[in-house]
Amino acid sequence: MKALDELTFDNRFARLGDAFSTHVLPEPLDNPRLVAASPGAMALLDLDPAVAETPVFAELFGGHKLWAEAEPRAMVYSGHQFGSYNPQLGDGRGLLLGEVYNQAGEHWDLHLKGAGQTPYSRMGDGRAVLRSSIREFLASEALHALGIPSSRALCVIGSDTPVWREKQERGAMVLRLAPSHVRFGHFEYFYYTKKPEQQKQLGEHVLALHFPECQELPEPYLAMFREIVERNAELIAKWQAYGFCHGVMNTDNMSILGITFDFGPFAFLDDFDAHFICNHSDDQGRYSFSNQVPIGQWNLSALAQALTPFISVEALRESLGLFLPLYQAHYLDLMRRRLGFTQAEDDDQKLVERLLQLMQNSGVDYSLFFRRLGEHAPEQALARLRDDFVDRNGFDAWAELYRERVARDPIQGQDLRRARMHAVNPLYILRNYLAQKAIDAAEAGDYSEVRRLHQVLSRPFEEQPGMDSYAERPPEWGKHLEISCSS
């Protein structure tokens, strides 16, 4: 394990030059202090978890100190926001400190969010508040633990720095890790500003670093785009299967690596609601839960437009046509596993759709239903779940189909069935009300609940003694909370 001063930097994005980013120093927080750190994320940098408790840790990730090898840069990009093109966005409050490579040879971007104003702050103060920083920290690590591709969060640093939003709050910083911070919007920026040389330079950079296997193929850019399509189809399939609503699927928030990026007003479903809108600024429901699949394809089409200098329109259209079949295959595979099936049958999609409609009509808790379905043998589990449904006759009809489907599946024994289902059906998810309780405590100076919640969410599939309250249905006030983009 390494100490903080032993990290090895290799700042490949910074070497692209000033057309891609601007050198900016972090603005330090007043009285920085550790709110929470992720040992799992620290391990990606070979860091000893004990260093999180040292004063220099808070000073580094609170903007007071920098490694000599770090090259803090604010990246420039553009993007489509709620369907409309915004010509220049960029890192308005975050800085790419540099890239660190670990003993396994993996490169990880170190990105400090809430680091102060940059040339791309667009009249903003460049700060992030404590509540949004805690949410990003918890969400990043929770999604990773669920097996959903995501950026990681090394730590949250709190402070006494005053920040004004709807009211005065305290500033904070999050240290985010990702193999790359290149977004769809990076390619859009150089396409729409008509900078073909820089766009080509960006493309070669991304190919060499993140899609090297595509370089050997006859059409490397086309191969790369198809890989991006596949990764995003799989990502969104996992969002839908686990009930995750991102909330702000603008193209500048979409990663070329197909990882969940830029957590804002996200939410996991409580009661199943296909039309749930977690972002209270989304008046039209563009980024509602049910729209995430078509919006994912729309965003890929926006990226495709930016790649027309490298790939024929016909080939791009053909590749975009792969998205929905790929999504459906990944989604159905996940849902079969959540229902306890080990083999595919033609009518599985209808069985899933019928179940979701029944859950929608009755307001059934999405995550708890699947967890409880695997607790007991099908007959007993279905009898216990029946009371959650208003349409008992409809549920009985579905339950009969489910029993018949289970009987045809080759899985043997309830113990094996329970183990397989519990391995894909979490007991603990990051419900918004749990995050809010942790935030309320943290804003009062008590960080223990943030740390406890993080520990619980790091093992979502395992029953943890004494943690029953984290697996309960939310209270009425905690259901379907809409979260502001204000952060």
Curated annotation (Swiss-Prot):
Molecular functions (GO terms): AMPylase activity; ATP binding; magnesium ion binding
Pfam families in the record: SelO
Catalytic activity: L-seryl-[protein] + ATP = 3-O-(5'-adenylyl)-L-seryl-[protein] + diphosphate; L-threonyl-[protein] + ATP = 3-O-(5'-adenylyl)-L-threonyl-[protein] + diphosphate; L-tyrosyl-[protein] + ATP = O-(5'-adenylyl)-L-tyrosyl-[protein] + diphosphate; L-histidyl-[protein] + UTP = N(tele)-(5'-uridylyl)-L-histidyl-[protein] + diphosphate
Active site: D252
InterPro entries found in the cross-reference section: SelO
Signal sequence segment: none
Enzyme class: transferase
Binding locations of Mg(2+): N253, D262
EC number: 2.7.7.-, 2.7.7.108
Origin superkingdom: Bacteria
Cofactor: Mg(2+); Mn(2+)
UniProt KW keywords: ATP-binding, Magnesium, Manganese, Metal-binding, Nucleotide-binding, Nucleotidyltransferase, Transferase
Binding site for ATP: G90, G92, R93, K113, D125, G126, R176, R183, D262
Role noted for this protein: Nucleotidyltransferase involved in the post-translational modification of proteins. It can catalyze the addition of adenosine monophosphate (AMP) or uridine monophosphate (UMP) to a protein, resulting in modifications known as AMPylation and UMPylation.
Cross-referenced PANTHER family: PROTEIN ADENYLYLTRANSFERASE SELO, MITOCHONDRIAL (PTHR32057:SF14)
Record family assignment: Belongs to the SELO family.
Name used for this protein in its record: Protein nucleotidyltransferase YdiU
Gene name per UniProt: ydiU
